[in-house]
Amino acid sequence: FLLRVSPDLEWHVACLKCAECGQPLDETCTCFLRDGKAYCKRDYGRLFGIKCAQCRAAFSSSDLVMRARDHVYHLECFRCAACGRQLLPGDQFCLRERDLLCRADHGPPPDGAAARGPRSPAPPPAHLAEPVPGRPPGPRPQSHKAAEKTTRVRTVLNEKQLHTLRTCYAANPRPDALMKEQLVEMTGLSPRVIRVWFQNKRCKDKKKSILMKQLQQQQHSDKTSLQGLTGTPLVAGSPVRHESAVQGSAVEVQTYQPPWKALSDFALQSDLEPPAAFQQLVSFSESGSLGTSSGSDVTSLSSQLPDTPNSMVPSPAET
């Protein structure tokens, strides 16, 4: 008998075995083909199936896995390569080749000065000092007068005055002298207070824009830098069940009987069971009753033979 594994491949029953373990393969088990070789399901999954990117072990159909781009990990292997902390769903991490790094390990170093280049601008201070309107800024105190504190007069603006100044600033951040005189009449403030307020407002907006620009550059550098190495920032998702254990489709094995086999069996069966007329003729010849039989009996017997060319008649010597 032959085993047909695919439409154009056939094996003898004794020749169809797993190329790795030698297990006989038949129509009762699953067979996989690769490069002209047959494999059982266990060896095919072990050799050519998807493996964990960390431990390089194969997956079973019941394993829960974590995916990062094209890489698949066991739940226990989905850890930071630097600190060994297991990454949970929702954690931010960075993928460098097959290694995973948590945000704390791939983020910028705590020392901002070391991370900046020689031409990088210095970050703005955390707290910005604001000049107080109503009194011109005096000279900076010397080191021996650092302990002394000067009392500054602060001008408190009401809601109406602030609304008027902000509306004018939105229309023109640098008003001319005529506009300032109109603001003095509308708000009741001194020209010096109005001038200082516009200066402070422009300074605040400029520092705010510089700070926002630096934050955007820092976020961009966090995404593309990994302590001097490039990586891909990702967010861990929920574990999923690994269903595709092997890549490839199983091939059905069928028992196949060649056409000449059926013809040979028919010929053997015909030889074992001769026709009834032939058996009767043989029995007559062995018993010797053919010579004593009448011509009518011989004629009737010969008529039962399908391939006898002439009728048998008794010879004159026998009569």
From Swiss-Prot:
Localization per record: Nucleus
Keywords: Developmental protein, DNA-binding, Homeobox, LIM domain, Metal-binding, Nucleus, Repeat, Zinc
GO cellular component: nucleus
Feature: compositional bias, Polar residues: 218-230, 304-319
Repeat in keyword set: yes
A GO term, aspect molecular function: metal ion binding
DNA-binding region: 150-209
Major localization listed first in the record, in broad terms: nucleus
Domain of life where this protein originates: Eukaryota
Function noted in UniProt: Transcriptional factor that defines subclasses of motoneurons that segregate into columns in the spinal cord and select distinct axon pathways. Acts in conjunction with LIM-1, LIM-3 and ISL-1.
Protein name: Insulin gene enhancer protein ISL-2
Species this chain originates from: Gallus gallus
Gene: ISL2
